[in-house]
Amino acid sequence: FQTDLWQPGMAIVDFTNPEAAKWFAAGVRKLCEMGVTAIKTDFGERIPTKAVYYNGADPIHMHNYYTYLYNKTVFEVLEEYYGKGQACLFARSATVGGQKFPVHWGGDCSAEYTSMAETLRGGLSLCSSGFGFFSHDIGGFEATASPDVYKRWCAFGLMSTHSRLHGSTSYRVPWNFDEESCDVLRFFTKLKGKLMPYLFAQAVKTHTTGIPMMRPMVMDYTDDIACRYLDQQYMLGDSLLCAPVFRKDGVANFYLPEGKWYDIITGKTYEGGKYHAVTCTFMEMPVLAKPNSVVTFGAFENQFEYDYLEGADAMICNLEDGKTAEASIYDTKANLVLTIQATRKGNVISVETSSTDKTFTVSVAGTDKKITLQGGKGEIVL
């Protein structure tokens, strides 16, 4: 099958033919040798249902299964070249089993608020179907976003598992919109860099358990009826709730389950068990640490792959009397390097960390209380 639709000489490779798959893999390997570390496996969904396959497969069945073979072929080349656990795609199409070849993104959204909200709904649907990670075209793909839409999408995109600026007919670089867009993109990029110890630990959990890193509220709060219908917010890992702004007036609407929730950007605390409407500047988006949680932060904000333990710190968020909260830090090879446990009794929080030769600071959200440890135990008096 050959077409000249997007560029001359495009063709659909028959991955049921071992020689064809081998030929395609060799091309990918050449890219690796040039220094390419990840591959965008675009398309894969427009597979004709009247095609004849090398192995005689039913073309109706192959319409969905094709993308599995396509992504598998590319993923395995990357894994072979860079090592186990180092392969990464940016895949457009998927089917059952496709979660084994991450990451997937929702392609070709429009550059407007309604499409931004639809993008989140699609991502939550994907992650509810067993896919661990999700990305999207920051700023929208079709047309060109207004500066306000672009800035809100930057916040949403950087607080997704994976982040990429992308567009069809115009560049999505921030200086093409306005000066503040540069500031917004810089701020949320740095926030993501600081959150990497937390985010990477959550990614390791997703890899080992299959629990999606970005997920609808109902997956964590199955007994809270209100969480069954929430499609404009999500959990980013176990401890952070994100509520993007989908309105020109800057209002973020979100619901919080019971307990006190701490906004790691503004430092404000919100009561759970009810809905909230919060007006946000472009430098704000509700990113709320749930009650009885520990969120870890790294020492670097301008890079994403570093020693996550070096200069790291942790924040205990609204730990209730009699409750225990835990967190872990992994190195970039997914080896566990630190565990932290905090238990509250009355006005005293007992903190215990696994042994380490590096100092580690633990603070209490919304207060000036903190303690510095180098392995071992300590107490924080509230």
Where are these regions (language model features)?
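Catalytic metal-binding/acid-base residues of hydrolase active sites
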Residues: G44, S110, G139
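Aromatic- and acidic-residue-enriched carbohydrate-binding clefts of CAZyme catalytic domains
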Residues: F1-D14, K50-M62, L165-N176
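Active-site groove signature of glycoside hydrolases
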Residues: F24-A51
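Catalytic core of carbohydrate-active enzymes
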Residues: F75-A87, A94-W105, E118, G122, ...
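Acidic, His- and aromatic-enriched active-site or binding-groove loops in soluble protein domains
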Residues: F1-W6, I60-N71, W105-S125
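Active-site-adjacent "subsite" loops/lids of carbohydrate-active enzymes
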Residues: F1-M34
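Non-catalytic scaffold segments within catalytic domains of secreted glycoside hydrolases
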Residues: Y53-K72, D178-L185
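Short, solvent-exposed S/T- and G/P-enriched segments that are highly enriched in secreted/extracellular
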Residues: Y270-H276, T372-E379
